[in-house]
């Protein structure tokens, strides 16, 4: 049975080779979007990492929180690898093909795990919501409410959180 794994990463910066994951969150659903399981954990900051100030302002995860509540990167990456490589998983994110997925591949490689198996092995696949959301905005604009409280057009993930997916399936 196929399952969807909606996931997101918070990182110390944008450089997939030199930054690291600080937080991982995922929700696995069946094909009808019924929640099966939920995962969220912090990752301890490695000693060789200096977080980007911009990233810290964006995600608001302090170094103290990371160190107190986080697990080591090796353990975190093993958990992520197991989740994302579960047979018949379709991993889904928002801009994940250009950012999160590349970040994960570097983390998997750095921690001695197969970096590409979540893309093909065990009937696993991946999908990015960003191009789909863009197509809706351009060609079927009336389906979603696109403006934030200020009336400005906003297509980031927190807007999508307001949408009840089941109403549009």
Which stretches of residues belong to each language-model region?
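Conserved non-catalytic scaffold segment of RNase H-like nuclease domains
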Residues: 1-109
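A short coil-to-beta-strand element that immediately follows conserved catalytic motifs
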Residues: 35-38, 119-125
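Active-site donor-binding loop signature of nucleotide-sugar glycosyltransferases
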Residues: 43-45, 129, 165
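Acidic, Mg2+-coordinating catalytic module of metal-dependent nucleases/exonucleases
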Residues: 90-99, 103, 107, 144-169
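A short alpha->loop->secondary-structure connector
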Residues: 106-122
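Short alpha-helix plus adjacent loop in nuclease-associated cores
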Residues: 123-150
């Amino acid at each position: 049975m196929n399952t969807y794994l909606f996931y997101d990463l918070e990182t110390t910066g944008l450089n997939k080779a030199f930054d690291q994951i600080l937080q991982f969150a995922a929700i696995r659903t069946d094909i009808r979007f019924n929640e099966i399981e939920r995962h969220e954990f912090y990752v301890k900051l490695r000693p060789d990492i200096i977080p980007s100030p911009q990233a810290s302002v964006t995600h608001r995860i302090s170094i103290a929180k990371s160190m107190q509540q986080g697990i080591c990167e090796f353990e975190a990456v093993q958990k992520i690898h197991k989740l994302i490589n579960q047979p018949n998983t379709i991993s889904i994110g928002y801009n994940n093909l250009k950012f999160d997925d590349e970040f994960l591949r570097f983390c998997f490689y750095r921690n001695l795990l197969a970096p590409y198996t979540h893309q093909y092995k065990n009937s696993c696949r991946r999908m990015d919501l960003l191009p789909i959301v863009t197509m809706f905005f351009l060609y079927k604009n009336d389906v979603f409410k696109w403006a934030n409280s200020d009336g400005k057009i906003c297509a980031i993930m927190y807007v999508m959180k307001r949408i009840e997916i089941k109403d549009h399936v």
